[in-house]
Regions:
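Conserved phosphate/anionic-ligand binding catalytic regions in large, soluble enzymes, centered on
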Residues: 1, 73-128, 175-191, 278-308, ...
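Catalytic alpha/beta core of large soluble enzyme barrels
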Residues: 110-115, 155, 159-160, 259-264, ...
């Protein structure tokens, strides 16, 4: 019984499988990658044409009903958390760098979607903006623009001073200069505004926010290109043609992107600027931020808290952590959510809204509480594909012996008690003191 403990499998799912699984009579053909390696290099209509040509010639090794293949993927996902479901065609169709290669897979956390080849190993430098801080107080949009522009410049600078473990990694990073700007504190930001995660108001806020981040990030990279020059493989890219991430967003039945709304910024003027040059081939990706968000004292990336109250162990010992969003709730207890008790379709909808504006992808976990069925999972992942997500991350299952509702109840009871006494949960209890990193501190939590 062999185990590959450091292998994290993902399913690189083409549109064709998602179509065929809807037909109980449709078959799925398995081909040898050694005989037909071109299938891994093709996507979209070209992939389907070659795939069906090989099927007609009988070149497959064996066949299974497409729905059986899909159910097998979902069963393994439910039992083990793997394989992560990622979508091959959507990732490649929206690839700004489709003129110089193909995306063969994501990174481990599924937010990075970059070309790879025998000559190049993809590298991406990541950073995350703390929305709970930046989007607070006066002039939040101006503060956001300042933060985004600074982050883009700094991430670009890392490319030139970085240590590269291989020449293939160095070649790739210097040729394409990809970066991945993301966020953390998203859920805390929503709670501070009094916005329910499971609401259309959330989608409206998310759309407006990520339009702004996308605009500011693209603008910053285009301005850097005028100052420092475009990345070497710019010519022929979607950027060079004035095609922006929002232009390639998947269209719904009405011919418009999901949750389409009037634009707030002058995208035509930006499009003309982008045609003249971009400093970076890719600029946005939402990483998990599991550790750095704890250090910053905010919620992880774009996620609903796994638990509102838990105990954490590190080099400093064991201590109780109460989710930082709790301190903003007041008496609006309905705003408090835990991931297992959120309708997962709201997670999909919110991710779809954000994905329109993002050139790479997002680390999007999904959560299966006790009683989740195969039909439920089919609906969730089919909807993720239909709404244009490029990737999903873990499917986290709930322990049969542990119900986190009690943790939420404990927090709410503490809040009610505090309110009754004319107070709120203290910052010391509701918010861990943010720690500043220092290269001179060998025990810094971010390095563990």
């Amino acid at each position: 019984r062999l185990r590959a403990h450091d292998v994290f499998p993902a399913a690189w799912v083409p549109d064709l499988l998602m179509k065929r699984k809807e037909d109980p009579e449709a078959m799925w053909s398995f081909f040898s990658p050694h005989k037909f390696p071109e299938l891994h290099e093709l996507y979209g209509e070209e992939f389907e044409a070659r795939y069906e040509e090989l099927e007609a010639l009988g070149e497959f090794e064996f066949q299974l009903p497409a729905i059986k293949v899909w159910r097998h993927i979902l069963s393994n996902l439910f039992e083990t958390g793997h394989p992560w479901i990622t979508f091959k065609d959507e990732s490649n169709r929206r690839n700004p760098q489709s003129h110089v290669g193909v995306i063969h897979h994501s990174n481990l956390c599924t937010e990075i979607t970059l070309n790879t080849s025998k000559e190049e190993t993809a590298v991406c430098n990541l950073g995350s903006i703390n929305l709970a801080v930046v989007m607070s107080g006066d002039n939040p949009l101006e503060k956001l623009r300042t933060a985004v522009r600074l982050a883009i410049r700094n991430l670009d600078s890392v490319i030139d001073v970085n240590y590269y473990p291989s020449e293939r990694a160095k070649l790739s990073n210097l040729r394409h200069r990809p970066i991945g700007l993301g966020v953390m504190g998203y859920y805390e930001w929503l709670v501070k505004q009094g916005v329910d995660f499971e609401s259309d108001q959330h989608l409206e806020q998310a759309d407006a926010l990520f339009e702004a981040i996308s605009y500011f990030a693209i603008e910053a990279s285009a301005d850097l290109a005028q100052e420092l020059g475009s990345y070497p493989s710019f010519e022929g890219s979607k950027w060079s043609q004035g095609i922006l991430p929002i232009d390639t967003a998947k269209k719904m039945e009405d011919g418009k992107p999901f949750f389409d709304r009037p634009r707030r910024f002058d995208w035509e003027a930006l499009r003309e600027k982008v045609k003249k040059g971009m400093r970076n081939s890719n600029i946005m990706a939402i990483a998990p931020t599991a550790t750095i968000s704890n250090i910053a004292g905010t919620t992880q990336c774009t996620e609903v808290p796994f638990l509102l109250q838990f105990y954490k162990t590190n080099l400093g010992g064991v201590y109780k952590v109460i989710d930082p969003s709790v301190r903003h709730v007041g008496t609006n207890y309905h705003l408090l959510k835990e991931a297992f008790y959120v309708d997962q379709l709201w997670i999909i909808k919110a991710a779809a809204v954000r994905q329109k504006w993002i050139c790479q992808s997002q680390s999007t976990n999904l959560f299966a509480k006790q009683g989740t069925t195969g039909r439920d999972l089919d609906l969730i992942y089919t909807e993720a594909h239909r709404k244009g997500l490029k990737t999903t991350y873990y499917l986290r299952g709930q322990s049969a012996t542990k119900d986190s509702a009690s943790a939420k109840d404990d927090v709410i009871e503490a809040l009610k008690s505090a309110v009754a006494q004319g107070a709120t949960l203290s910052d010391a209890e509701a918010h861990q003191q943010a720690k500043l990193c220092s290269i001179f501190e060998p025990d810094c939590e971010s390095c563990q």
